[in-house]
Swiss-Prot record:
Named cofactor requirement(s): heme
Location of the protein in the cell: Membrane
Name used for this protein in its record: Probable cytochrome P450 519C1
Protein's UniProt keywords contain Ubl conjugation: no
Record-linked SUPFAM superfamilies: Cytochrome P450
Residues noted as binding heme in the record, renumbered to the chain: 470
Record's bilayer topology term: Single-pass membrane protein
GO cellular component terms given for this protein: membrane
Residue stretches spanning the membrane: 1-21
Listed InterPro entries: Cyt_P450, Cyt_P450_CS, Cyt_P450_E_grp-I, Cyt_P450_sf
Name of one Pfam family that matches: p450
Record EC number: 1.14.-.-
């Protein structure tokens, strides 16, 4: 009985101490939300759509405020100028990633491009990826992979159209996206395996078998594990961590097989793809590590690239189709632009296809994609950072170890006119205005006493900003254009019942719409 009483007193004291700690206000601290509860902090304020609920809190609490996500003190940044200060000007003070248990469980300790801390290795890995993307030969390979996979996808859609079968957007876009990333990662091996998005093997081929564990990882990471934020609950979530490890292990084994084959054909003087660049780096710069350690490091690096590039593109493609279905006039305007660009080169004797070289001539479609990325930012709260040291931002003190979340969704909604209206023309007007100002050699004038308001390039940051932004922006943009352009060129897309689709969000690593099927009407 005495032991039970002692435990009771201990719990009461712990709850009181935790409540005082989380509600204590210091003079120069970032303003903190009131009513942080013991143990859970402000988690109860997040709801099903954290990015939307946090954005609502901005109106009352300002563009920077802090809250407690369980045990983790977190600063939410929605003010674009403060966001630039953190992500660009004081980048080195906010360059590391938080050590969340789920992410460590998945990454094997955080050794990869996304979750690795900003140490001596990260800039090198970043340079490997970015330089490989910009090399002429590799760029040519990337574009070839994207166009080939687009053609395969369009052919599959033609089959659906001919037999009047609903096209399941989530399944096919997910497979397309992973096929692109894998093709870029190790092109030659994928050429030999002939990654195909066709109807005969969509549920049984090796790529689909890889897609399933990847989507499982996205589900487990994206839905949020409360034990990441409340440490005392971790013993009760061992099964969740085990599931995450199992899914990540399946991806690792798939890539291990490709790595072993890849290594046999590796030629240092003639790197073929991104995996070759990782191999070259590890074998050149890690002379004291074993072959097994080198292999693990290379595969983990490749895995990070796959996980970084897969879900966001697939989610954006789903949203583009949803908005085009719900806005048929915009869909037809895109089609007319494509026809105009193709001109006499497009006739009935040829398969309809628009190549990536035409991208710069399709500005309206590019603006449609940008508007989708604005209104449905795939990573609405970006990837979290932590403060690496005590520092000051905008007169506020931020303590070392504080987690930082950049509210990309909030910036693209609170700093534009009519944020909930899907309007690609806003981008056309914006760029016309910028061009006029450049011609007149004028500085942009403040709008509504805020020089960020309606400055779309500075408030719409779907791929983040600064030195640690998304390294694969150019690849993602090419992916999105290639698929969107060729779907619109070949099909009129509608909902199955002819009604508007519901734009309800499903939270995960990226924000998806609820799964929907598409009715494809061939434009031929």
């Amino acid at each position: 009985m005495n032991i039970l009483l002692l435990i009771f007193y201990f719990l009461v004291c712990f709850l009181i101490f935790d409540f005082i700690k989380k509600n204590k206000v210091k003079k120069y601290d970032v303003p903190t939300l009131s009513y942080a509860l013991p143990i859970i902090g402000h988690l109860y304020k997040l709801g099903v759509n954290p990015h939307r609920n946090l954005t609502k809190l901005v109106e009352k609490n300002g563009g920077i405020f802090s809250l407690w996500l369980g045990d983790i003190k977190t600063v939410i940044v929605t003010d674009p100028s403060i966001n630039k200060e953190i992500m660009v000007k004081q980048f080195t003070n906010f360059s590391d990633r938080p050590r969340l248990k789920s992410f460590e469980s998945f990454t094997g300790g955080g050794v990869n491009l996304i979750f690795i801390d900003y140490n001596e290795k990260w800039p090198v890995i970043r340079k490997i990826v970015s330089s490989s993307i910009t090399k002429t030969k590799i760029i040519s390979n990337y574009k070839e992979v994207i166009e080939n996979q687009t053609k395969i996808l369009i052919n599959s859609m033609r089959t659906h159209s001919k037999i009047n079968e609903p096209f399941k957007s989530k399944k096919y876009f997910g497979k397309f996206s992973i096929s692109i990333v894998l093709g870029i990662m190790f092109k030659q091996d994928n050429d030999e395996k002939q990654i195909n998005i066709n109807d005969n093997n969509i549920d049984n081929d090796p790529i689909t078998k890889l897609t399933e564990p990847i989507q499982q990882v996205f589900l487990l990471l994206g839905t949020g594990n409360i034990s990441d934020f409340i440490k005392i609950l971790r013993p009760f979530f061992k099964n969740e961590y085990k599931k995450l490890n199992n899914s990540a292990s399946k991806v690792f084994k798939f890539m291990e097989e490709i790595y072993d084959q890849h290594l046999l054909k590796f030629d240092k003087s003639n790197p073929r793809d991104l995996m070759d660049y990782f191999i070259e780096y590890e074998f050149t710069n890690s002379p004291n590590t074993t072959l097994e350690e080198k292999k693990i490091s290379i595969i983990k690096g490749c895995m990070s690239f796959v996980f970084a590039g897969d879900d966001t593109v697939a989610a954006t493609l789903e949203w583009v189709c949803l908005y085009l279905i719900n806005n048929p006039a915009i869909q037809e305007k895109c089609y007319n632009e494509l026809i105009s660009v193709l001109g006499d080169n497009n006739n009935e004797s040829k398969i309809k296809f628009i190549s990536l070289k035409e991208r710069d001539n399709c500005q309206y479609l590019i603006n449609v994609i940008k508007e989708v990325l604005r209104i449905r930012t795939p990573l609405p709260l970006s990837v979290p950072r932590i403060a690496t040291q005590n520092c000051e931002i905008n007169g506020f003190f931020i303590e070392k170890g504080t987690q930082i979340l950049s509210n990309a969704f909030g910036m693209s909604h609170l700093y534009v006119d009519e944020p909930n209206v899907f309007n690609p023309d806003r981008w056309i007007n914006y760029y016309n205005q910028k061009q006029q100002q450049q011609q007149q050699q004028q500085q942009p004038q403040p709008i509504q006493n805020n020089n960020y308001f309606n400055d779309l390039d500075r408030v719409c940051l779907p791929f983040s900003t600064g030195p640690r932004n998304c390294v694969g922006i150019s690849i993602a943009e090419l992916n999105l254009f290639s698929v969107c352009a060729n779907i619109i060129l070949n099909f009129q897309i509608k909902s199955i019942d002819g009604m508007q689709l519901k734009d309800i969000e499903v939270s995960g690593i990226s924000i998806h719409p609820i799964p929907f099927s598409i009715k494809l009407i061939s434009r031929n």
